């Protein structure tokens, strides 16, 4: 989960994806094999046509091939791979075409549901296309009619992967080589949202009919206590409730349980799909209004409006016997229902900071 960062006066700096790093290093290694030339940088073309220089840490002969490496620069994005060494080892082969292999620190797909087949190295389609295009052009320039065996690795990738969703997605042994544009946009969250979609797709492909989308570890633990769900049924949505709800339009499941902290669920109840404090805030007067509909006294409503936090407002309501937690979950369920297909049964749970259940609503109680 990403932490809120202070505002910065200067524009945030973009970086490059692991797919761009893999393209640059595989091109540099292949160029050394075919032309005998090396340098401390290589220029690649991104999917939208931009030409960018990529600095190399090394480019040298390796066994019966060549290898090159670059340090992943994610710009100002808090990417887990920022600063990691991405490297490519390339061998020439008699058969034409480009064949990809997972090196140290790059994972292998072990579950269906992803865009890659089981057993394939976790090198996504666009990075594969980028490497194929650059290597094919290089081969044509040198009159080379053979093929390439390309192994991509990330130094320390196996340990870094444990900080990502890869193990839950069934990508084992390391990280994925990612990217659709070749560029990392700071705080775009596109990779995180893509992993949410992948998590749902993998769950469906493996026969899971009930998923639980949770805002964090405490809410995941609450769902584990309530249901005997397999690990792949637990979707870490963080603040991106909209990523879950909208994806279910085209990839529905039988049942969705939404679980989060009371404050996050309050935002969802208020009609927000991005629950991060940068994009949505808790509406204390709205909470007081919902309490009023449940019979809250004028004094309680006033104290709730003046509360410091949603948790304080909740405690005030519960102290007077007003079931605010359940009401907030009911409002959140109605909003989620307006997005999710009717075939998906919904339920919503809210927890406090200790992970205790403070509210729930559902179309099916269990």
Swiss-Prot record:
Lineage: superkingdom:
Bacteria
Top enzyme class, one word, equals: transferase
Pathway entry: Cofactor biosynthesis; adenosylcobalamin biosynthesis; cob(II)yrinate a,c-diamide from sirohydrochlorin (anaerobic route): step 6/10
Give EC number(s), comma-separated.
Answer: 2.1.1.195
Q: Which reaction does it catalyse?
A: Co-precorrin-5B + S-adenosyl-L-methionine = Co-precorrin-6A + S-adenosyl-L-homocysteine
A GO molecular function held by the record: cobalt-precorrin-5B C1-methyltransferase activity
Q: Which UniProt keywords apply?
A: Cobalamin biosynthesis, Methyltransferase, S-adenosyl-L-methionine, Transferase
Kindly give the Pfam families that the UniProt entry links to this protein. Answer: CbiD (PF01888)
Keyword Nucleotidyltransferase tagged:
no
Question: Which cysteines link up through disulfide bonds?
Answer: none
Known InterPro entries for this protein? CbiD, CbiD_sf
- Keyword Glycoprotein part of the UniProt annotation: no
A Gene Ontology annotation in the biological process aspect, one of them, is: methylation
Record-stated family:
Belongs to the CbiD family.
The protein here is known as: Cobalt-precorrin-5B C(1)-methyltransferase
* Gene name for this UniProt entry: cbiD
């Amino acid at each position: 989960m990403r932490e809120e960062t202070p505002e910065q006066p200067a524009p945030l700096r973009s970086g490059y994806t692991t797919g761009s790093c893999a393209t640059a290093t595989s091109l540099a290694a292949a160029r050394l094999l075919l032309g005998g030339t090396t340098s401390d940088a290589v220029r690649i073309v991104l999917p939208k046509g931009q030409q960018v220089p990529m600095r190399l840490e090394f480019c040298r002969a390796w066994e019966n091939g060549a290898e090159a490496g670059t340090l992943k620069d994610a710009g100002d994005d808090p990417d887990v791979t920022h600063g990691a060494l991405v490297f490519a080892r390339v061998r020439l082969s008699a058969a034409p075409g480009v064949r990809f292999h997972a090196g140290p620190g790059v994972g292998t797909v072990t579950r269906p549901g992803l865009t890659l087949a089981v057993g394939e190295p976790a090198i996504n389609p666009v990075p594969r296309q980028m490497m194929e295009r650059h290597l094919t052009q290089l081969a044509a320039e040198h009159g080379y009619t053979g093929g390439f065996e390309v192994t991509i690795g990330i130094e320390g990738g196996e340990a870094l992967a444990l900080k990502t969703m890869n193990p839950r997605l069934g990508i084992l042994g390391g990280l994925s080589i990612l990217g659709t544009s070749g560029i990392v946009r700071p705080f775009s969250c596109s990779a995180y949202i893509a992993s949410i979609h992948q998590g749902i797709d993998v769950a469906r492909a493996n026969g899971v009919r009930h998923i639980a989308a949770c805002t964090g570890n405490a809410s995941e633990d609450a769902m584990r206590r309530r249901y005997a769900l397999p690990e792949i049924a637990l979707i870490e949505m963080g603040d991106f409730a909209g990523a879950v709800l909208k994806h279910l339009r085209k990839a529905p499941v039988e049942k969705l349980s939404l679980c989060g902290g009371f404050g996050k669920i309050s935002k969802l109840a208020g009609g927000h799909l991005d629950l991060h404090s940068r994009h949505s805030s808790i509406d204390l007067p709205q909470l007081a209004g919902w309490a009023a509909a449940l019979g809250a006294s004028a004094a309680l409503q006033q104290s709730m409006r003046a509360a410091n936090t949603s948790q304080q407002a909740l405690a005030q309501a519960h102290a007077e016997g007003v079931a605010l937690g359940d009401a907030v979950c009911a409002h959140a369920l109605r909003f989620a229902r307006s997005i999710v297909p009717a075939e998906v049964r919904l339920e919503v749970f809210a927890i406090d900071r200790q992970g205790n259940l403070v509210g729930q609503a559902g179309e099916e109680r269990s």
